[in-house]
């Protein structure tokens, strides 16, 4: 809304990290929206400095700045326009409860902006978290052709979240206001240690320091309904007044780092994109398929009948299986001291892995090991039953798939690149369909899409497009403030 500061500059600069999907131009829109202000709020006195805004936008890398008048955005006046109404459950708490009609005004003007500009990407700050959640719902439910990109809250050196309204604060008031982020941060640390958030205690502490508390609440970070801290990502948010200045801030509460589960059939490209996705976001990559392949390789080395669960179980005793991150190429896989990184990709292993993986003793042993690896989170795992059996509480679940014909084509390329003989495409497609049948009909942990997973069909998509889609899905569930993108 203008009065740009360095947090707005960070929004503009963030576009430079979009890689090959970076938009050709970056437009900054400056518009003090009358629909967002209540009758007694500061619309008339809201800070405006267009010359300074233009300078900051240019310095930060903007291609242009658009500062329309009210008549340009709302021909005939704001009161004569249709308005979009935000679903009541999304604004029943936090700022929505305190400022009735505010978010209706936000979505109405943003929808108007998107219709006029038709951007590829909409960049928003995570500081106004409720606004970001509501606008993501708007884009998703209306099917608008735009990606929503969130940027972590930017803070001044003293810890106060950047805001255009901070300039209202006198020196002494700013010192008072610092209690807002400081006590939120302390509550987050205590929550990590297993202590419950004391909302009444926070309110009392702020009031004793001279701040007027409008609200302090814990809500689900995505449906914005009341929630106590636990496994799910929880938002602890507050709004206070310091003198005449209204300030909002928040922190996220979570018992562990995020987990991503990517399931799908053989040949869907899971390993390739998951490895790149993990590297892009700084997550540990857990290739569970490689673990099953390694056990299959071991059965072949010991001449064990892969169909005999009793015989297979004997080689699981004292099993030493290691996955070692690699700076380049596939993840290193070692079993009982043997480096089997390449060997487990052979056609011989591929033809038997479904049989071995179907045994309950194998899945029990490897699932337990995978869950131990993921106890602290901070990882992405790919396989067949990650979202349904291994990490059913993962923050993001994706079912990555492609048509059998497309998967056969990819398998042929992979075999050729590895120096293995390449069967006819029709034969490969038949093998893949049979593998799908075996994986989806086995009694133990069959291949199936988790109820809360997002299906991603990758036919016709480049590897980079699949990775960017996964990142977008991740950021809907995991804010930058919870898991920052490396180098951001």
Curated annotation (Swiss-Prot):
Q: Show the Gene3D superfamilies listed in the entry.
A: HUPs, P-loop containing nucleotide triphosphate hydrolases, Pantoate-beta-alanine ligase, C-terminal domain
Q: Which NCBIfam families match?
A: cmk (TIGR00017), panC (TIGR00018), PRK13477.1 (NF010004)
Recorded E.C. number(s)? 6.3.2.1, 2.7.4.25
Keyword list (alphabetical) reads: ATP-binding, Cytoplasm, Kinase, Ligase, Multifunctional enzyme, Nucleotide-binding, Pantothenate biosynthesis, Transferase
The residues that the entry says bind beta-alanine are 36
Pathway info: Cofactor biosynthesis; (R)-pantothenate biosynthesis; (R)-pantothenate from (R)-pantoate and beta-alanine: step 1/1
What is the name of the protein in this document?
Bifunctional pantoate ligase/cytidylate kinase
Question: Any idea which residues are catalytic in this one?
Answer: 8 (proton donor)
What is the species listed in this Swiss-Prot or TrEMBL entry? Prochlorococcus marinus (strain MIT 9303)
Region described as Cytidylate kinase: 252-488
What SUPFAM superfamilies does this protein's entry cite? Nucleotidylyl transferase, P-loop containing nucleoside triphosphate hydrolases
